């Protein structure tokens, strides 16, 4: 691959606003991503009255499997042939608005031929005209829940509930990855791209040849199975056993002249978690087969307790007004893929010479927090309500990814490359990046909500109404800014991933005589999110805020032999809002995905 050369450039304020790039290589990528999901579930629930006790037993089993397929195909000219690319209208930031013009016509199937265009997998010895990833996930849950409830007269405590839950969850990820090679040819063989479709190449402004690669394995391509350090990292299994014993008392009393109802209780939760995976020494991974890239199977885990008290009270202020108070210790469990064992490691190729690696953490603890919630609610008979709520969560522990000091001695072999220079010369000590628990953080904010039927204004508007809510949430956790040269660097503060600062929902509706018609909009501000990269690994990125509009209409037959039958139609993302990623400026997106509108039509019958 030759270095690019910019010529015929127009420069304004230090920015090359237009020019021609030579030694440029055009690669037409046509991808297909799909999945087949299967879900089975069985449940059994039974209640039994024994004297003054009401008992219940609930048994459930569920199993979900998902087989995904990700075809990546490349087309263009042979590896040795170069092209040029002209561009205009660049101002230094508007990447998605630049106009590009290539020298060759990549919509011409005589130019865009299926082949190994770049020799990405190592050249003639390991040709790659595409890639096929087929991850397989199996997730099984078994659970039992036993409860017993009895009425009592212990002051404000009017009933007691005792319970026990036990959940067993097993999740595993495996699959097959491999290089696609043109069938029956040499390393850089070419094949015609089927069909005649063309499509615009992202935001480039020019068209390229397009096709659907499904069904091409065996007819156009043959598969060479592949394993390497990254692929081994996707093979893992996790077992989680959670036992919960709890006691709860129902409350009904009077405090400072205000009647209240609620509950108080405590849970004792025991967790036993085990993760499995593979360790790969990159120095020994010299190829992409199990023989040339050996791996070592490892398992690890942890056991721990959480004690979680809680209190919920609802005060009756009179005139259909209520004040609600909630206080509790809560936990939120880690994603199971973060609990996997296994890692890959090797000598750092940049910066300080030191062993570095990455993987999961079977000893990871959940998010732990203390929460306090306060809300005021005003009802208008059975017609509507308004409410205002404030909430605060003190994060005791949270989960983030960061490097930590680690001794790789148990995994070192005679072929492992150790640092030759610097402070870590000859040392098995290094840095290991994994999900880990941090301490301290806050989440707080408020929420306003209202449901207002228009019949409160006029009986002529009976059936019409509006629902609206708005939340404003601030959050922050501190992460150590860790680099190879300064392990204990300054801390940086970031918001909790996945959480928008502001979220607003609006729903206009008509509900009467069996008709339900609604238009809804959800607006959220930009946030720090997670997306899957080209290797199916989750990566943090900023997501631009969006407004999504949904429409729905249904009718339930009110009489006759079809009474109880409902017909419905729904349109989701009716305004076709795009999914936009960005780095610093939300008005300069780095990636755009248009998921389009989704329509649902259906019928149901209620017995």
Where are these regions (language model features)?
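C-terminal beta-signal and adjacent terminal beta-strands/loops
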Residues: 184, 522-532, 555-607
């Amino acid at each position: 691959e030759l270095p690019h050369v910019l010529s015929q450039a127009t420069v304004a304020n230090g920015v090359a606003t237009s020019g021609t790039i030579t030694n440029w290589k055009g690669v037409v990528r046509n991808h297909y991503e799909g999945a087949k999901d299967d879900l089975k579930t069985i449940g059994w629930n039974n209640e039994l009255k024994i004297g003054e006790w009401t008992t219940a037993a609930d048994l459930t089993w569920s199993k979900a499997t998902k087989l995904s397929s990700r075809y990546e195909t490349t087309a263009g000219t042979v590896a040795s042939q170069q092209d040029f690319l002209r561009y205009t209208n660049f101002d230094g930031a508007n990447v998605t608005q630049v106009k590009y013009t290539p020298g060759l016509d990549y919509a011409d199937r005589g130019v865009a031929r299926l082949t190994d265009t770049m020799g990405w997998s190592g050249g003639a010895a390991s040709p790659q005209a595409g890639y096929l990833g087929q991850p397989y996930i199996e997730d099984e849950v078994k659970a039992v829940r036993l409860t017993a409830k009895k009425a009592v007269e212990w002051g404000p405590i009017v009933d007691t509930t005792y319970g026990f839950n036990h959940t067993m969850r097993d999740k595993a990820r495996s699959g097959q990855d491999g290089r696609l090679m043109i069938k029956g040819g040499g390393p850089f063989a070419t094949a015609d791209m089927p069909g005649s479709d063309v499509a615009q190449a992202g935001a480039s402004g020019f068209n390229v040849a397009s096709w659907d690669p499904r069904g091409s394995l065996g007819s156009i391509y043959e598969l060479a199975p592949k394993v390497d350090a990254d692929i081994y990292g996707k093979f893992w299994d996790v077992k989680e056993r959670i036992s919960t014993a709890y006691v709860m008392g129902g409350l009904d009393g009077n405090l400072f002249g205000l009647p209240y109802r609620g509950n108080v209780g405590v849970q004792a939760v025991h967790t036993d978690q085990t993760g499995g995976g593979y360790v790969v020494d990159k120095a020994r991974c010299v190829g992409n087969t199990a023989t040339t890239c050996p791996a070592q199977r490892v398992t690890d885990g942890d056991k721990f307790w959480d004690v979680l008290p809680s209190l919920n009270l609802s005060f009756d202020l009179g005139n259909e007004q209520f004040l609600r108070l909630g206080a509790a210790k809560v936990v939120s469990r880690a994603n199971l893929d973060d609990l996997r064992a296994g890692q890959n490691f090797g000598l750092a190729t940049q910066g300080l010479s030191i062993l570095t690696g990455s993987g999961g953490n079977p000893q990871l603890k959940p998010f732990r927090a203390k929460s306090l919630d306060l809300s005021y609610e005003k009802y208008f008979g059975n017609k509507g309500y308004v409410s205002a709520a404030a909430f605060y969560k003190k994060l005791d522990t949270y989960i983030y990814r960061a490097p930590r000091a680690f001794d790789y001695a148990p995994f070192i072999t005679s072929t492992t490359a150790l640092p030759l220079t610097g402070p870590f010369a000859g040392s098995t000590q290094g840095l290991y990046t994994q999900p880990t628990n941090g301490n301290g953080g806050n989440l707080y904010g408020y929420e306003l909500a209202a449901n207002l039927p228009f019949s409160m204004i006029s009986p002529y508007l009976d059936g019409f109404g509006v629902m609206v809510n708005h939340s404003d949430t601030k959050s922050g956790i501190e992460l150590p800014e860790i680099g190879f040269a300064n392990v204990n660097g300054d801390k940086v503060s970031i918001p909790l991933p996945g959480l928008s600062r502001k979220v607003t929902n609006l729903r206009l509706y008509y509900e009467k005589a069996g008709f339900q018609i609604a238009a809804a909009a959800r607006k959220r501000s930009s946030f720090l999110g997670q997306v899957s990269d080209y290797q199916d690994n989750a990566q943090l990125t900023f997501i631009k805020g969006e407004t999504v509009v949904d429409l729905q209409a249904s009718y339930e037959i009110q009489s006759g032999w079809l009474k109880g039958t409902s017909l419905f139609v729904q349109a989701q993302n009716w305004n076709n809002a795009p999914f936009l990623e960005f780095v610093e400026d939300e008005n300069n997106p780095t990636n755009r995905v248009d998921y389009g509108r989704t329509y649902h039509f259906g019928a149901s019958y209620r017995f």
